[in-house]
Amino acid sequence: MFNLLVLATTNQNKVREFKQFVADFPVEIKSLSDFGPLPEAIEDGSTFDENAYKKALHYSKVLGIPAIADDSGLAVEALSGAPGVRSARYAGDDATDQDNCRKLLAEMKGETNRKAAFVCVLSIAVPSGPALTYEASCEGTILDAPRGSNGFGYDPLFYYEPFGKTFAEISMEEKNKVSHRGKVLMELSAEFDKVMKWLEKRVLEEMPEQPDHTEFKDNDWSR
């Protein structure tokens, strides 16, 4: 079985998290940090799906091995899905989490519809092009002031009703059980043996016109 994957990130927290979810499988996980300087992927897509695939395919081609990448962010209903793919840069390319939260609060001032969702898309690509994609979301509401000191990004503003708290008021362990990213990783790990077999077949083949993904229950492209 093919047993080498690169996780398209230099964030070691993401690497550790991913390794925990696939710990029971005979696979070696590398990160971009293991390969030295590499050309950066251009994430100019208009959707999370596009950016996750662009990143996964880019690093898969550069390194010649399967790559896994994710793209995630906050989608606010009253803002037509914004911040969306610009979640990390909502207040500018060099914006801090606090800057982004302040801009979101300003945009939402006086708005009664506070519905929002965190969205995460994970893409697994091989050098010739075929990919699997997994997507999950977590719904909540945007408060009119931050609460809590845990987490990062928009967590202090994202109120999760089942817990009666914001994501910044709960532990990382609690968050991972219900968050968009945690759900995606649980879906992937539930059928990771199938994913590895799929990769073994696809890693050296030419890109088919329409890859067959119907065997994957939770893979969105199979629908």
Question: What do these predicted ranges mean?
Answer:
Residues 2-6, 12-221:
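Anionic-ligand binding patches
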